[in-house]
Amino acid sequence: AGSYALTGSYPQVRAWQQATAQTPGLLARALDPQAQPLNEEEMARLALGLRTRLQNDAGNVEGWLMLGRTGMVLGNAGTATGAYANAYRLDPKNSDAALGYAEALTRSSDPEDNRRGGELLRRLVSRDHTDIRVLSLYAFSAFEQQRFDEAVAAWEMMLKLLPAGDARRAVIERSIRLAQEK
């Protein structure tokens, strides 16, 4: 038994137990804008703890959304895409789930994921063409896929929605010029 502790997977089990125990505190810090931001190791422990929780609470949309966000921050495309897919499947009308899933798909290295993400973004834009977050992601996705006319149309729609002094206007105007040159 003593040699198992040294050679077995006990250290991994202990790390998992610690991550699970720390999840509530890490989650509270992650959600508190006044708290010190989590470092990468803490984010990884939060992701492990969330995955563990979601094994027993698979219908928790907010938990899947948090795991998706954590996966994006950690650059773990598989975790992010899977978590957002679950959140979207559970609540397709949830705009955070839909937008998170679309973003994860459009950032994927798989062209089929990119296509599916673009389709989802087109549906989101047609559902609500006044959501700046959706329009922004749609425009950049269209630009990356060399659909420059669609990108320009989305950015022009954003310009109509943003107030005159908004700092984002200059970036959008530059993006429009760049797309028109292509």
Regions inferred by a protein language model and the residue ranges of each:
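Structural marker of alpha-solenoid helical repeat scaffolds
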Residues: N56, L90, R127-D128, L161, ...
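Alpha-helical adaptor scaffolds
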Residues: A30-N39, M43, V61, M66-V73, ...
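Long, contiguous interaction/recruitment modules in multidomain scaffold/adaptor proteins
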Residues: A1-L48
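TPR/TPR-like alpha-solenoid repeats
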Residues: T70, A104, S141, L161, ...
